Amino acid sequence: MYVPKESQPKQGGGASGKVKDGKRKIVAQNKKARHDYAIIDTYEAGLVLTGTEVKSLRQGRASLTDGFVQIDGNEAWLHNAHIPEYSQGTWTNHTVRRKRKLLLHREEIDKLASKSEETGHTIVPLALYFKDGRAKAEIALARGKKEYDKRQTLREKQDRRESDRAIAAAKRKQRGE
C-alpha cells in the first residue's frame, strides 16, 4: 500500500538526543541572552555553513553564549558562535569561531540595521536548529536589562513557581493524596 510522504513518520534525527520542538531539532540555545536582554522581536535566519560545520551541528555540538549578530553593509553576520571541529574531519575542518553569514530578507536586514543603531539595542542569537533539514538561527532584536530588571524577573519567576506549587498541593489535598 502506498502512503504519501507527508503522512509517513519522520525518521530519527540522529544520535544527538537533542529536543525536537515540532519540526525543529534544536541544537543550541542561548539561555544567557534571555536572562540578560529584554527580547523585542525575533527573526528566523538561514545560515551559510561549510560541510563540517553542518556535521558538527548534527552531532548537537554548538554554543551561542558569547555570540552576537552584526549588520555589515547589507549583510547580517553571526560572530563568535562556537561550533567545534567535526571529529571525523581532516584538513577540510572549519575554523571554530569564524563569522557566519545569516540569510534574511532585505527588509528584515534594513529594519534590524535601523533598530540596532538606537542606543541600548542589539541583535543576539537565541537558538540554532534544523528545520526541514536546513540549519537555521533564531535571532532577536533586544534591549539590555539593568541589574534590578534581572532581579525582578527572577523574583517573578520564583513567585510564579511557588504559586504553582501551592495550587498543585491544594489539588492533591482535595483529591485525598
UniProtKB/Swiss-Prot annotation:
<protein>
    <recommendedName>
        <fullName>SsrA-binding protein</fullName>
    </recommendedName>
</protein>
<dbReference type="GO" id="GO:0070929">
    <property type="term" value="P:trans-translation"/>
</dbReference>
<dbReference type="InterPro" id="IPR020081">
    <property type="entry name" value="SsrA-bd_prot_CS"/>
</dbReference>
<keyword id="KW-0963">Cytoplasm</keyword>
<dbReference type="GO" id="GO:0005829">
    <property type="term" value="C:cytosol"/>
</dbReference>
<dbReference type="GO" id="GO:0003723">
    <property type="term" value="F:RNA binding"/>
</dbReference>
<dbReference type="InterPro" id="IPR000037">
    <property type="entry name" value="SsrA-bd_prot"/>
</dbReference>
<comment type="function">
    <text>Required for rescue of stalled ribosomes mediated by trans-translation. Binds to transfer-messenger RNA (tmRNA), required for stable association of tmRNA with ribosomes. tmRNA and SmpB together mimic tRNA shape, replacing the anticodon stem-loop with SmpB. tmRNA is encoded by the ssrA gene; the 2 termini fold to resemble tRNA(Ala) and it encodes a 'tag peptide', a short internal open reading frame. During trans-translation Ala-aminoacylated tmRNA acts like a tRNA, entering the A-site of stalled ribosomes, displacing the stalled mRNA.</text>
</comment>
<feature type="region of interest" description="Disordered">
    <location>
        <begin position="1"/>
        <end position="23"/>
    </location>
</feature>
<feature type="region of interest" description="Disordered">
    <location>
        <begin position="148"/>
        <end position="177"/>
    </location>
</feature>
<keyword id="KW-0694">RNA-binding</keyword>
<feature type="compositionally biased region" description="Basic and acidic residues">
    <location>
        <begin position="148"/>
        <end position="165"/>
    </location>
</feature>
<dbReference type="InterPro" id="IPR023620">
    <property type="entry name" value="SmpB"/>
</dbReference>
<comment type="similarity">
    <text>Belongs to the SmpB family.</text>
</comment>
<dbReference type="Pfam" id="PF01668">
    <property type="entry name" value="SmpB"/>
</dbReference>
